[in-house]
Amino acid sequence: MKRFKQILFIASALLGGSLFTACSDDNDTPVFPEKEEVTYDMSGFARGADVSWLTEMESSGYKFYTAEEKEQECMSLLRDLGMNAIRLRVWVNPENDTDDVRGWCNKGDVLLKAWRAHNLGYRIMIDFHYSDRWADPSQQAKPQAWADYSVEQLKQAIADHTKDVLSALKEKGIDVEWVQVGNETHQGMLFPTG
């Protein structure tokens, strides 16, 4: 029960922290430190968390702590609490958003978080929103750059974007176990076309 409360606290902190976000800088190229060779047993049942806002939260000064009040890097802390899978959302051009996402969760940001998760032995899910911002039941807007595309052009853009992100991950040696196509798409996606 104590472990569940710790996981619930961390998940709540991540979710709550996403409500108080800041802007990213204009640099879209992540820096990848040397990979440390460490092996973790992350097999079996998937126990995961969506940490898509992590880099933005860290940029805003958020810190994460153990139950003993010792500061610890978030993904490492989640792993120590029993997590073995990470979900990361990817948007097409979040720089086009005028509200709250402004550059976070683009390909470079996702690569950086996936690289960190990979080095900790996490199983990784990539969630393609196929939008410049949140995609959920109330909004499934096409990316601004795709707004006037025909159905054929849209199909090609989806394929190209998906291949681009997954190829970039593969190039860094990052294995993706799951790919989620769209987010909360039970009413469709890529509106008004889809």
Residue ranges and their predicted role:
Residues 1-9:
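Bacterial N-terminal signal peptides that target proteins for export
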Residues 8-17:
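Hydrophobic alpha-helical targeting segments used for export or membrane insertion
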Residues 11, 46, 81-85:
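Conserved long hydrophobic alpha-helices within structured protein cores
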Residues 16-39:
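Bacterial Sec-dependent N-terminal signal peptides
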Residues 18-19, 63, 100, 140:
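Residues in and immediately flanking transmembrane alpha helices
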Residues 32-77:
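Boundary/entry segment of secreted carbohydrate-active catalytic domains
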Residues 77-194:
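Substrate-binding cleft and catalytic face of glycoside hydrolase catalytic domains
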